[in-house]
C-alpha cells in the first residue's frame, strides 16, 4: 500500500505542472459553483501558496543576483540592455494602445464614493522620489518588506563587491543560489493546489455579478491587454528573433501568465518565471538578473489600467485633450506603472497622478480609483498576467536573438 502511495506522489511531482494547474483551475470553478462555503474554506490553500511565493521570492532575487554577478566572467554577454529596452518599449506602447482605444471607444463612469484611507502619490515627482528612496533602504528591511528595487540595488552592489572575493566564497554563493532554487522548485510544485484554492475562494466571494454595470470598461481594459499580449508583444519578439513568435508567446502565457493571473503579483511570480527560463534553456547569467528587473519595470498592464481609467474620467467630465497631452499621458502612465511594481492593485493608486495632469480634483480621482477596485477582480489579474508573462517572453526573445547572431557569425 505504501508503495502505491509513493508511486502516486512521484507521478504527481513529475507530472506536467501546466496540466495539473488546469485541473486545479477547473476543480476550483466546480467547487465554487457547487458549494460556496466549502469554496471559501479552501481559500486557505491559495493564501498559503501566494504567501509561500512571496516569502521565498525576495531571498531568491537577492541570492540569485548576487551569485550571478559575483560569478560572472569577463567577456560573458548578459543581454540585459536589449531586454530592458523591450520592457520599456512594451510599457510605452501599451499606454499608446490604451489612448487610441479610449479615443475610439470612449467610456463613461458611474462614480462611486472613494475610500478616505487610500493616500495616492501627489505627483509624478513623488513617484520618482519614492523609487529613489526605495533604492537606498536598509538591505534587511528591503528583504523583510519585499522592496524589490532596494533588493536589486543591494544585490547588484554586493555582486560586484564579491567579484573580488576568493574562489571559495564565490562557490559558496553559487551553492546558496542552488539551494534557494531547490526550495522554490518545491513551492512551485504546489501551484495546482494553490490555484485551486484561489479560484474557488475568489469566485465564491465575489462572483461576477458586481462587474455587470462595468462590463464595457472592463471589456476595453481586457481588450487592450489582449492586443498587447497577442499582437504588439509578438511584434517586438519577431523584431528580435525574426521568426514566428507565437509558439514562444503561447508558452509564456500558458506557463507564466496563468499562474500570475491568480497570484496577482509580478513579484510572487518571479520563481515561476525563473523555472520557465531554466526549462527553456536560457542563459542563467541573463535571466537571473533580467526577470527581477522585469518585475519592476515591465508594466504594460499597469500602463493600460492607468491610461484607460484616467481617460474614462476625462471623457465623463467632458474635458478635451489634444495629441500632445495624450502622448504626455502615455509617458506619465509608463513612469507611474513602473512605480506600481510588485504591489497587487498598485496601479490603481497611481491613477490620481495621471488625473492631476488634466486638472481633475483629487476627490473625483479617488472615485475613479474606487471604480478600479470594483472591477479589480479581473482587471488586476489580467494586468499581472500580461506584466509577468512579458518578463520571461522578452528575456527569452533577447537570448534567442543573441544565439541567432552568434550562429550567423560562427
From Swiss-Prot:
InterPro entries given in the database record: Na-dicarboxylate_symporter (IPR001991), Na:dicarbo_symporter_sf (IPR036458), Ser_Thr_transp_SstT (IPR023025)
Subcellular location field: Cell inner membrane
Xref: SUPFAM superfamilies: Proton glutamate symport protein
One Gene Ontology cellular component: plasma membrane
Membrane topology field: Multi-pass membrane protein
GO MF entries: neutral L-amino acid:sodium symporter activity
Presence of the UniProt keyword Transmembrane helix in the record: yes
Transmembrane segments: 15-35, 49-69, 82-102, 118-138, 142-162, 190-210, 217-237, 299-319, 331-351, 358-378
Keywords (A to Z) from UniProt: Amino-acid transport, Cell inner membrane, Cell membrane, Membrane, Symport, Transmembrane, Transmembrane helix, Transport
One of the protein's GO biological processes: serine transport
Protein name: Serine/threonine transporter SstT
Organism, as annotated: Erwinia tasmaniensis (strain DSM 17950 / CFBP 7177 / CIP 109463 / NCPPB 4357 / Et1/99)
Amino acid at each position: 500500500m505504501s508503495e502505491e502511495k509513493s508511486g502516486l506522489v512521484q507521478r504527481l511531482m513529475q507530472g506536467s505542472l501546466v496540466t495539473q494547474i488546469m485541473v486545479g483551475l477547473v476543480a476550483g470553478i466546480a467547487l465554487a459553483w457547487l458549494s460556496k462555503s466549502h469554496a471559501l474554506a479552501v481559500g486557505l490553500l491559495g493564501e498559503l501558496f501566494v504567501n509561500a511565493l512571496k516569502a521565498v521570492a525576495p531571498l531568491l532575487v537577492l541570492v540569485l543576483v548576487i551569485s550571478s554577478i559575483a560569478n560572472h566572467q569577463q567577456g560573458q554577454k548578459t543581454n540585459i540592455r536589449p531586454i530592458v529596452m523591450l520592457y520599456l518599449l512594451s510599457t510605452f506602447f501599451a499606454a499608446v494602445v490604451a489612448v487610441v482605444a479610449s479615443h475610439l471607444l470612449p467610456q463613461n463612469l458611474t462614480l462611486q464614493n472613494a475610500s478616505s484611507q487610500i493616500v495616492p502619490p501627489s505627483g509624478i515627482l513623488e513617484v520618482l522620489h519614492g523609487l529613489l528612496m526605495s533604492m537606498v533602504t536598509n538591505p534587511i528591511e528591503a528583504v523583510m518588506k519585499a522592496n524589490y528595487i532596494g533588493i536589486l540595488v543591494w544585490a547588484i552592489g554586493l555582486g560586484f563587491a564579491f567579484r573580488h572575493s576568493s574562489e571559495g566564497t564565490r562557490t559558496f554563493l553559487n551553492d546558496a543560489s542552488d539551494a534557494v532554487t531547490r526550495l522554490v522548485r518545491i513551492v512551485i510544485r504546489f501551484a495546482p493546489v494553490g490555484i485551486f484554492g484561489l479560484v474557488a475562494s475568489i469566485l465564491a466571494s465575489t462572483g461576477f455579478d458586481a462587474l455587470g454595470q462595468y462590463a464595457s470598461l472592463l471589456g476595453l481594459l481586457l481588450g487592450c491587454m489582449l492586443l498587447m499580449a497577442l499582437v504588439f508583444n509578438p511584434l517586438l519578439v519577431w523584431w528580435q528573433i525574426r521568426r514566428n513568435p507565437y509558439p514562444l508567446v503561447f508558452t509564456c502565457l500558458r506557463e507564466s501568465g496563468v499562474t500570475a493571473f491568480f497570484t496577482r503579483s509580478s513579484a510572487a511570480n518571479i520563481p515561476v518565471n525563473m523555472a520557465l527560463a531554466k526549462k527553456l534553456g536560457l542563459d542563467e547569467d541573463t535571466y537571473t538578473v533580467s526577470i527581477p528587473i522585469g518585475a519592476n519595470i515591465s508594466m504594460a498592464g499597469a500602463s493600460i489600467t492607468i491610461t484607460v481609467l484616467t481617460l474614462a474620467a476625462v471623457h465623463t467630465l467632458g474635458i478635451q485633450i489634444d495629441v500632445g497631452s495624450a502622448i504626455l499621458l502615455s509617458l506619465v502612465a509608463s513612469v507611474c506603472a513602473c512605480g506600481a511594481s510588485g504591489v497587487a492593485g498598485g496601479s490603481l493608486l497611481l491613477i490620481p497622478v495621471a488625473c492631476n495632469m488634466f486638472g481633475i480634483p483629487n476627490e473625483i480621482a479617488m472615485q475613479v480609483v474606487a471604480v478600479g477596485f470594483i472591477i479589480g477582480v479581473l482587471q488586476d489579474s489580467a494586468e499581472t498576467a500580461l506584466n509577468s508573462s512579458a518578463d520571461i517572453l522578452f528575456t527569452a526573445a533577447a537570448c534567442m536573438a543573441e544565439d541567432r547572431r552568434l550562429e550567423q557569425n560562427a
